[in-house]
Amino acid sequence: MSAATRWPEQLVVAGTDTDVGKTVVSALLVRGLNATYWKPVQCGDLMVGGDSGRVAALVGLTAAQASGRILPEAYRLAAPASPNQAAAAEGLVVQESRLALPAVGGPLIVECAGGLLVPLRDDLLQITMISHWRLPVVLVARSGLGTLNHTLLSLEALAHRGIPVLGLVLNGEPHGANRSSLERIGRVPVLLELPPLAEPGPAAFDAVWPRVRAPGCSA
């Protein structure tokens, strides 16, 4: 799987909302770029391994491979809630020092929790940590009705903080009008329109990867 040469060494996968498909997109990038994966804060789904376990399965990693390429979360919180609320339920406060980027050799994919402005604690938004990391963002959004408002608001928030955006991944049934509107108004490329995958996993990702538009490439 090529195209890795045009991608930055490290990047953040963020979303316009929760449950927009960040984990599937992260897994696609981990497989396509042969990258390491890190989700700093996991809220809920601990019994099934959380998103880290899901990425390992989607990428097709053995247990031995996953131990080297799926990094442990800084926070594993039981409640399926925003990080500030999930941490408070356990008597914890999320500390920035624990969210420092890990040192890895090779590409790194960092998956955020929820949307850009979700609070990690009451005085620390997730987008602030993205700014501290100084990494570019792949923004995952829904493809259908409502995505223009959510996506343009997210792009505005990123631009306001000077955070570079590599491009968008639109998750769901392709919607040509929304794609063209976002590229024209948001002035960012759509890297991929990702339709629902019947069986997400290595074979599906390998079939999709050639359609991914590497950052900086013309359509």
Residue ranges with predicted function:
Residues 121-144:
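Inter-motif core of Ras-like GTPase G domains
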Residues 20-21:
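Conserved glycine(s) of the Walker
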Residues 99-121:
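Switch II (G3) loop of P-loop NTPases
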Residues 13-14:
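Hydrophobic anchor at the beta1->P-loop junction of P-loop NTPases
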Residues 4-10, 24-93, 98, 102:
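N-terminal phosphate/diphosphate-binding loop that engages ATP/GTP or pyrophosphate donors
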Residues 39-40, 138-141, 166-172:
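Short internal beta-strands
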Residues 4-5, 156-219:
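C-terminal lobe/tail of nucleotide-utilizing enzymes
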